[in-house]
Amino acid sequence: MTTNLADLIRNIPDFPIPGIQFKDITPLLQNGAAFKEVIDTLAARYEGRALDAIVGIESRGFIFSAPLAYRLGVGMIPIRKPGKLPWETFAVEYDLEYGTNKLEMHRDALAPGARVVVIDDVLATGGTVAAACQMVEMAGAVVEEVAFLIELTFLKGRERLAKYPFFSMIQY
């Protein structure tokens, strides 16, 4: 990599709640060369693989999944918060430190046997991505890899996703 991407991630203490060190990716996104480098790195990793789609998780996962899907010439499948998709959906509830949340994906988004990469911006505990992967598998599709811009290693999300091939660009 030509840019130190980690230098473009801003740390925001006590956001959104006290005790959280939020990783703000907006400086990286504002830097055209750095954003291009992220997409180019991901595209180089997945070019030539027999992929059918890139799955992006609302909302910041969309920032990376859409241009990557475009570059690879494959579909982009959005996984969204409840009530945002207009058609029949799979839904998976998952645990957070302070409660539960739910994600949805259109039932017809992926054909059985489709091969996908699931992308999100930050890996923390892994609950969100595990739920996304569960929906991909409910559709009969195959998770070829999970990928992240940032991995918060101290939260051990990678362990929760141990059954999937894994890639992260920046580790804290």
Curated annotation (Swiss-Prot):
Gene Ontology CC annotation, any one: cytoplasm
Signal peptide boundaries: none
PROSITE patterns, sorted: PUR_PYR_PR_TRANSFER
Keywords on record: Cytoplasm, Glycosyltransferase, Purine salvage, Transferase
This protein's record includes keyword Glycosyltransferase: yes
Key word Cell membrane present: no
EC number per UniProt: 2.4.2.7
EC supergroup of this enzyme: transferase
Catalytic activity field: AMP + diphosphate = 5-phospho-alpha-D-ribose 1-diphosphate + adenine
Main location group: cytoplasm
Pfam families, sorted: Pribosyltran
Pathway this chain belongs to: Purine metabolism; AMP biosynthesis via salvage pathway; AMP from adenine: step 1/1
Compartments, record wording: Cytoplasm
CDD domains referenced in this protein's UniProt entry, alphabetically: PRTases_typeI
GO biological processes: adenine salvage; AMP salvage; purine ribonucleoside salvage
Record-level Gene Ontology MF annotations: adenine binding; adenine phosphoribosyltransferase activity; AMP binding
Sequence similarity: Belongs to the purine/pyrimidine phosphoribosyltransferase family.
Function: Catalyzes a salvage reaction resulting in the formation of AMP, that is energically less costly than de novo synthesis.
PANTHER family given in the database record: ADENINE PHOSPHORIBOSYLTRANSFERASE
Entries under NCBIfam families matching the protein: apt, PRK02304.1-3, PRK02304.1-5
Assembly with partners or alone: Homodimer.
Name this protein carries in UniProt: Adenine phosphoribosyltransferase
Taxonomy of the source species: Bacteria, Bacillati, Chloroflexota, Chloroflexia, Chloroflexales
Gene encoding the protein: apt
